[in-house]
């Protein structure tokens, strides 16, 4: 038995390359189904976030296909353009990488907390698809436990060190704009969080709602709402537009935007695949930020020092996983 992984992330490829691996739930179900048709593969887990897509595979020792090629084939994507923009790890390096990932030290924003939830969700979806074998289950369990231990032991980041608060900082830095009214497109988890943070910081925030889901929505306290179909009309009254949806299509299109009498000066796109047509940055006096443009944290001296403490903590969980593997293999010999 062997564990292998491969992935693409913000360090290896820009957003226009990565967004090809943003899967809907229906697509993900089909991808899992296609992967498990290979009898040499025992289990698989796919982590898909705005900054990365990674595939973890439990397989026979002599399985020699590139894991990322496996993912591409299962998703109906040509592997050729991605041959030089992904990384592959095998054996002990896989759980070490996963532990570091879950701790947030491989994130674009150092130490961010959302990745733990994303790792949990990834193994949960794999389990739901009946794609996770016991080796992957235990490996992910140990990585999540390691991340929780790190978070409770070390202070990796402040509340402000998140993509939402990075977006807030961009807004606050626009000193000459006199920003008051902000439109948030999207009422999912990210959209609600962004709306809450804006209101907490004294901005008037309006969040879009889909008409057919009005009664199912949770609306942040003191937030205004507008039907999604009226978003362009609302933009006339706004200084900033932030979009954070899971839509496979643009929520802000160039052609529709040009029809507005008064176009907001600042657009922030928190989605992958992108919500906002990138060509709008060619309009005069328009600023557009996407998840890459919001900026990655540099590895500071403080981060390097923290990394040593993190390595000491996760080593225990890596050892625990190895002990479990030895026990599991020992049972097989009885």
From Swiss-Prot:
Source lineage: Bacteria, Bacillati, Bacillota, Clostridia, Peptostreptococcales
Gene designation: hemA
Residues annotated as catalytic: 50 (nucleophile)
NADP in keyword set: yes
Note: During catalysis, the active site Cys acts as a nucleophile attacking the alpha-carbonyl group of tRNA-bound glutamate with the formation of a thioester intermediate between enzyme and glutamate, and the concomitant release of tRNA(Glu). The thioester intermediate is finally reduced by direct hydride transfer from NADPH, to form the product GSA.
EC number, UniProt record: 1.2.1.70
InterPro entries: 4pyrrol_synth_GluRdtase, 4pyrrol_synth_GluRdtase_N, GluRdtase_N_sf, NAD(P)-bd_dom_sf, Shikm_DH/Glu-tRNA_Rdtase
Assembly and interaction partners: Homodimer.
Family membership noted in the UniProt record: Belongs to the glutamyl-tRNA reductase family.
Role, per record: Catalyzes the NADPH-dependent reduction of glutamyl-tRNA(Glu) to glutamate 1-semialdehyde (GSA).
Keywords: NADP, Oxidoreductase, Porphyrin biosynthesis
Gene Ontology MF terms in the entry: glutamyl-tRNA reductase activity; NADP binding
Listed Pfam families: GlutR_N (PF05201), Shikimate_DH (PF01488)
A biological process from GO: protoporphyrinogen IX biosynthetic process from glutamate
Residues that bind NADP(+): 186-191
The protein's name: Glutamyl-tRNA reductase
Gene3D superfamilies reported for this sequence: Glutamyl-tRNA reductase, N-terminal domain (3.30.460.30), NAD(P)-binding Rossmann-like Domain (3.40.50.720)
């Amino acid at each position: 038995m062997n564990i292998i992984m491969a992935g693409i992330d913000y360090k290896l490829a820009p957003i226009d390359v990565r967004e090809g691996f943003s899967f809907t739930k229906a697509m993900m179900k089909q991808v899992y189904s296609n992967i498990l048709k290979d009898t040499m593969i025992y289990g698989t887990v796919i982590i898909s976030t705005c900054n990365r897509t990674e595939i973890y595979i439990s397989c026979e020792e002599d399985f020699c296909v590139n894991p990322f090629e496996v993912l591409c084939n299962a998703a109906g994507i040509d592997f050729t353009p991605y041959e030089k923009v992904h990384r592959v790890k095998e054996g002990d390096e896989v759980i070490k990488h996963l532990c570091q990932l879950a701790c947030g030290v491989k994130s674009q924003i150092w130490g961010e907390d959302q990745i733990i939830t994303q790792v949990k969700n990834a193994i949960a979806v794999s389990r739901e698809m009946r794609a996770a074998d016991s080796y992957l289950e235990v490996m992910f369990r140990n990585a999540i436990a390691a991340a929780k231990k790190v978070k409770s032991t070390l202070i990796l980041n402040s509340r402000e060190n998140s993509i939402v608060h990075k977006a807030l900082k961009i807004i606050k830095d626009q000193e000459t704009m006199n920003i008051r009214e902000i439109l948030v497109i999207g009422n999912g988890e990210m959209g609600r969080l962004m709306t809450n943070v804006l209101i907490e910081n004294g901005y008037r925030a309006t969040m879009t709602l889909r008409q057919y889901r009005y009664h199912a929505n949770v609306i942040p306290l003191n937030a205004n709402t507008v039907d999604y179909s009226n978003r362009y009309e609302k933009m006339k009254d706004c200084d900033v537009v932030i979009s954070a949806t899971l839509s496979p299509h643009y929520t802000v299109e160039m052609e529709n935007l040009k029809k507005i009498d008064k176009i907001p000066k600042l657009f922030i796109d928190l989605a992958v695949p992108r919500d906002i047509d990138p060509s709008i940055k060619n309009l005069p006096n328009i600023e557009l930020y996407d998840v890459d443009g919001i900026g990655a944290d540099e590895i500071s001296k403080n981060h390097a020092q923290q990394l040593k403490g993190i390595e000491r903590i996760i080593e225990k969980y890596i050892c625990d996983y190895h002990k479990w593997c030895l026990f599991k293999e020992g049972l097989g010999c009885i």
